[in-house]
Amino acid sequence: MRKDFFFAAAAVMAFAAMPIQAQNSRIVEEGGSGPYKAIMMEEASLTTHTIFRPQDLSKFDKKNPLPVVVWGNGGCANSPSGHINFLNEVASQGFLIVAIGPSNYQQQEAPRPGQTGDVPRMGGGMPGGMGGGMPMGGGMPGGMGGQRPQGAPQGAPQGGMGGGMPRMGGGMPGGGGMGGGMSMGDPEGLKQALEWAIAQNADKNSPYYGKLDIDNIAAAGMSCGGLQALHMLDDARIKTILVMNSGFFGTDESEDKASLAKMKQKSVIWILGGSTDIAWENGNDDFKRMSGSMPACLVSLDGIGHGGTYMQPNGGDYAKVAGAWLKWWLKGDKEASTMFTGNEPGVGKMAGWSIERKNIK
């Protein structure tokens, strides 16, 4: 039986929902190891999201613009707190990252993009009607699972009692109130991030005026956030997609699966955590369905599982691999491309990593 990768959301969200320090900006890990020391911050013009970017914007202009990455979080969480080391490290390589959710998660009162109910709270409802809240401490939640919201993608969890691992097509486990807001895979938050970046680049009163490379934008995300990124497949403004610990699920006839064969003018990479990653089957099946001439890659770190290396120092190996992919596709960095090209791609030389490719030489 095919596994639903959202089984692992309970384990991931135990830490992913933890609040970031209550402040408008923060230096994470001394700004990262890249050439552009990064900062995590909020912008008054986009309070529903968190920005990760180089601290010194004076180094960027129309001749050296910042590519943009829009990011969706694991569990469709309204906070990037479970990924800050990773996002900060990638930003230090010279990228503007716009992540769904405010940095001050615990005190957030405003609804997130597309939200129709209360914001998720600690021990409260998971967003998107996917069931109850995840408890602190990593214990498996109980209680009533959520209902699939109207218009949710095929295969979205619905109903069912919690208290244990959810079934295929069953509800996310409970433990709190009903979740409100964005349905599973809803890319609205990513679209708002993208449109904000484009508008800021054109606004003469913005600190980002003329400094962003709006022709080179990536959509990326982990687990449920990876589904959000995949649902940007038909957005012509997106150049590449990073699907991390994620993949479409459903039947062979599902619209989501069919969309993979129709993808045009994009590249996509799946970054998985080995056979113990609950998204392993989903991601591999998606990769196999890629057809035509579009570049596609599947890389995996054996044994790391669904949680990845996001909160390891400087984001761990995931930041190295994702950063190289972004530098290749958004900056044209030939050295970075060697991580994925040639007879002996660099990813394959990294301990524990494997790589498969389509239309990449």
Question: Where are the regions a protein language model picked out?
Answer:
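Short amphipathic alpha-helix adjacent to the substrate-entry channel of hydrolases
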Residues: 81-109
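N-terminal cap/lid segment of alpha/beta-hydrolase-fold proteins
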Residues: 23-64
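Sec/Tat signal peptide C-region and signal peptidase I cleavage site
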Residues: 18-22
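Alpha/beta-hydrolase active-site loop
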Residues: 118-128, 162-164, 169-214
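Short beta-strand element of the alpha/beta-hydrolase
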Residues: 63-74
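Primarily recognizes the serine-hydrolase "nucleophile elbow" in alpha/beta-hydrolase
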Residues: 192-262
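The feature captures the conserved acid-bearing segment of alpha/beta-hydrolase catalytic domains
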Residues: 239-312
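Alpha/beta-hydrolase-fold serine-hydrolase catalytic core, especially in secreted/extracellular enzymes
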Residues: 148, 165-166, 172, 294, ...
